[in-house]
UniProtKB/Swiss-Prot annotation:
Name of the protein: Lipoate-protein ligase A
Taxonomic placement: Bacteria, Pseudomonadati, Pseudomonadota, Gammaproteobacteria, Enterobacterales
GO molecular function: ATP binding; lipoate-protein ligase activity; lipoyltransferase activity
Main location: cytoplasm
Subcellular location: Cytoplasm
Other comment: In the transfer reaction, the free carboxyl group of lipoic acid is attached via an amide linkage to the epsilon-amino group of a specific lysine residue of lipoyl domains of lipoate-dependent enzymes.
Function: Catalyzes both the ATP-dependent activation of exogenously supplied lipoate to lipoyl-AMP and the transfer of the activated lipoyl onto the lipoyl domains of lipoate-dependent enzymes.
Origin superkingdom: Bacteria
Gene3D superfamilies referenced in this protein's UniProt entry, alphabetically: Bira Bifunctional Protein, Domain 2 (3.30.930.10), CO dehydrogenase flavoprotein, C-terminal domain (3.30.390.50)
């Protein structure tokens, strides 16, 4: 039986692909070396310890139907589109060595005619007239007996969209968690016009086979058929859940303030695991009672626009005379936390 395994996903769903990755990683024999090739449609992928409200423009992502996906490895936030090729190398210990997988990717690029080199712990760069430019970023995960190295290669990514989604709104957010470091990047198409995802995948798999001296048939993973992986349904449900992608954010505080025709409002939220643990309201409104009631209702509420809006609108039952003010308040709060 071969010690190698090659999997290729034909899904562009980030939650599907990350669930496949997680299942394979948990269940692979310790003697196996795995290469998984995949790519995602419009997605911001954040590190395990990151806060999406701090790292991302979540409002614009929602408007543009860009998904958020939290991965199980560390590191920073990245934007994926179909101009990215994603790779994952897995191995049991002591075989696992990220320098080996890095050299495989460098050999693949060299075979395509691109001279790249490792920079720091996570990046691959190429030299251009404007200086070094990043073409690949990576992250890692290790357990007691195995590890993986996954990353992306920029082929023809829409680099203008990086700034759209990775620059958060200027919210008054005091947040813990790992902050992303932005790098100067370039696409491989600048060096190899017309290069395709399929060509890059072929180069990586050939370099993978060459390094280990054996070949295997590729297994195609498709969303049209549930992958034959134990616990895949449960893993996918978790990977696609709000509780994982947003709710796992480190604790943070959020200050909102706005002035309406009927008075100024200042809201202070403390948020932990996606739930509001403390809500304070300050106002110079002549009728502060609805806002005081709102503070009580928001305690324990999910920090989600639809849930906050629901709690605001529920106040109309007790304060029907606020039929003008409460919808304004509701729309403002929902917009501010998206």
């Amino acid at each position: 039986m071969s010690t190698l395994r090659l999997l290729i996903s034909d899904s562009y769903d980030p939650w599907f692909n990350l669930a496949v990755e997680e299942c394979i990683f948990r269940q692979m024999p310790a003697t196996q070396r795995v290469l998984f090739l995949w790519r995602n449609a419009d997605t911001v992928v954040i590190g395990r310890a990151q806060n999406p409200w701090k790292e991302c423009n979540t409002r614009r992502m929602e408007e543009d139907n860009v998904r958020l996906a939290r991965r199980s490895s560390g590191g920073g936030a990245v934007f994926h589109d179909l101009g990215n090729t994603c790779f994952t190398f897995m191995a049991g210990k002591p075989e696992y060595d990220k320098t080996i997988s890095t050299s495989i990717v460098l050999n693949a690029l060299n075979a395509l005619g691109v001279s790249a080199e490792a920079s720091g712990r996570n990046d691959l760069v190429v030299k251009t007239a404007e200086g070094d430019r990043k073409v690949s970023g990576s992250a890692y995960r290790e357990t007691k007996d195995r590890g993986f190295h996954h990353g992306t290669l920029l082929l023809n990514a829409d680099l203008s969209r990086l700034a759209n989604y990775l620059n958060p709104d200027k919210k008054k957010l005091a947040a813990k968690g790992i902050t992303s470091v932005r790098s100067r990047v370039t696409n491989l198409t600048e060096l190899l016009p017309g290069i395709t995802h399929e060509q890059v995948c072929e180069a990586i798999r050939e370099a993978f086979f060459a390094h280990y001296g054996e070949r295997v048939e590729a297994e195609i993973i498709s969303p049209d058929k549930t992958p034959d992986l134990p616990n895949f349904a449960e893993t996918f449900a978790r990977q696609s859940s709000w509780e994982w992608n947003f709710g796992q954010a480190p604790a943070f505080s959020h200050l909102l303030d706005e002035r309406f025709s009927w008075g100024g409002v200042e809201l202070h939220f403390d948020v932990e695991k996606g739930h509001i643990t403390r809500a304070q309201v300050f106002t110079d409104s002549l009728n502060p009672a609805p806002l005081e009631a709102l503070a009580g209702r928001l305690q324990g509420c999910l920090y989600r626009a639809d849930m906050l809006q629901q709690e605001c609108e529920a106040l109309l039952v007790d304060f029907p005379e606020q039929e003008k003010e409460l919808p304004e308040l509701s729309a403002w709060i929902a917009g501010a936390v998206r």
